[in-house]
A protein has these predicted regions:
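Conserved short histidine dyad/triad with adjacent acidic residue
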Residues: 76-92
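Conserved metal-binding segment of the jelly-roll/cupin
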Residues: 80-83, 109, 119-138, 150-151
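Short strand-connecting beta-turns/loops that link adjacent beta-strands
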Residues: 67-68, 93, 112, 140-142
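Short, charged/polar surface micro-motifs in flexible loops or helix N-caps
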Residues: 67-71, 80-84, 102-106, 152-154
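Residue-level recognition of conserved beta-strand positions in structured domain cores
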Residues: 77, 90, 101, 109-111, ...
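A short beta-strand-loop-beta hairpin characteristic of the jelly-roll/cupin
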Residues: 85, 94-121
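A short, N-terminal "cap"/entry segment at the start of jelly-roll beta-barrel domains
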Residues: 2-72, 87, 157, 161-170
Length: 170
């Protein structure tokens, strides 16, 4: 038996996904700041909860301008539920790096989402600014879990939806 606390998400810590249009839902900026431990030059968020949703993906409390005052970076742990799709979008003027901790995911990308790349646990992924892409969990039973780092401290404000045949009504 482990002495470490159980940090698995419970139903009480999960949020509802964002409404159509992809806007994030979840904790307020004040709640995010309240979860941050400021050590005077080094800041920490301990045992972050899953509390925000965006475009079919759940995010643990991460670090961004909203809670640590970062200027150029944000970072989260993202969970793509079994069988879920994060509909096509682009990152405007910022880079994204991912490290897949668990699961298998497909990125369909390109102007018409005509290209694809499959990734699994242990893979690093780099997404250039402005590349249209859609994220698909390849399993109907297991989530994809990834560390996501962005060269944008605002997280979702500079993400734009693009057409997708999978998007409801789109």
């Amino acid at each position: 038996m482990s002495d470490s606390p159980d940090t698995r998400p419970s139903a009480a810590t999960e949020s509802v996904d964002a409404p159509a249009g992809g806007h994030a839902t979840g904790s307020s900026d004040e709640e995010l700041r309240a979860r941050t431990e400021d050590g005077g030059g080094i800041l920490c968020i301990r045992n972050p909860e899953i509390h925000r949703g965006w475009n079919g993906i759940r995010y643990r409390t991460g670090m961004s301008a909203k809670n640590v005052g970062s200027k150029k970076l944000s970072m989260n742990v993202a969970t793509v539920p079994p069988g879920a799709v994060a509909y096509a979008h682009i990152h405007v003027d910022f880079e994204v790096m991912l490290f897949i901790l668990q699961g298998k995911v497909r990125h369909e990308y390109g102007d018409d989402l005509e290209r694809s790349m499959d990734n699994e646990a242990g893979d690093f992924i780099f997404i250039e600014p402005g590349v249209p892409h859609e994220v698909i969990n390849l399993s109907d039973t297991e989530p994809v879990i990834a560390v996501v780092a962005r060269s944008d401290a605002t997280e979702w404000e500079n993400i734009v939806d693009v057409p997708s045949k999978r998007r409801p009504g789109g």
